[in-house]
């Protein structure tokens, strides 16, 4: 049977998506599925999440609650990150066959190294480090060459009513948010078992 692919709609600006990335990284090999991360800018969902605005106390409290539940240590940024260029860059990385390396590097840069992922120089340096042509990367991101792909990701997420961060698509339905690894293991394993039991076309 072909490997089961689970789409995950995310944004690098979301601390909860960083936590999800950490948990998915542990479960992907264990459960044998492939994650398909698709960037959707959180700033397009709510004006409260625009780059540079401070995270509201209610958002910080929610993040602290998830950190406590999941045990994933992370310091949320004081202000919403500017992730637009990084998301477009992820589509260039996908095209270059380097999505996983780029994706990992951007999450680490934003949440572990406190690098400004809204800075094109920083993004280009990351791209070059993982083997992407830096000149093409810079030029494409600067001109918004992948904006249409990011817009298509949002339209696709909307079709599933996947408006939260992160959103896992399990069949036709979104699982919104991130749970402790034990809960995620149970939910994803149950979905994979159901899929494996379905008649193959």
Predicted segments, located by residue:
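C-terminal cap of thioredoxin/glutaredoxin-like
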Residues: 2-33, 38, 108-201
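Structural alpha/beta surface segment adjacent to cysteine/selenocysteine redox centers
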Residues: 18-113, 198-199
């Amino acid at each position: 049977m072909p490997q089961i692919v689970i789409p995950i709609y995310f944004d690098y600006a979301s601390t909860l998506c960083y936590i999800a990335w950490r948990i998915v990284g542990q479960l992907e090999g264990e459960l044998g599925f492939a994650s398909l991360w698709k960037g959707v800018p959180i700033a397009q969902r709510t004006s409260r999440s625009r780059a540079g605005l401070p995270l509201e106390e209610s958002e910080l409290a929610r993040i602290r609650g998830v950190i406590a539940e999941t045990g994933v240590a992370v310091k949320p940024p004081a202000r919403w990150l500017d992730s637009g260029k990084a998301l477009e860059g992820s589509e260039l990385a996908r095209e270059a066959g380097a999505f996983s390396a780029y994706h990992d590097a951007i999450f680490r840069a934003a949440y572990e190294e406190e690098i400004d992922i809204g800075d094109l120089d920083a993004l280009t340096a990351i791209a070059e480090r993982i083997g992407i042509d830096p000149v093409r990367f810079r030029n494409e991101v600067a001109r918004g060459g992948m904006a249409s792909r990011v817009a298509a990701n949002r339209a696709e997420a909307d079709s599933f009513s996947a408006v939260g961060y992160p959103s896992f698509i399990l069949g036709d339905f979104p699982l919104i948010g991130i749970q402790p690894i034990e809960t995620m293991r149970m939910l994803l394993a149950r979905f994979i078992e159901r899929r494996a039991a379905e008649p193959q076309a």
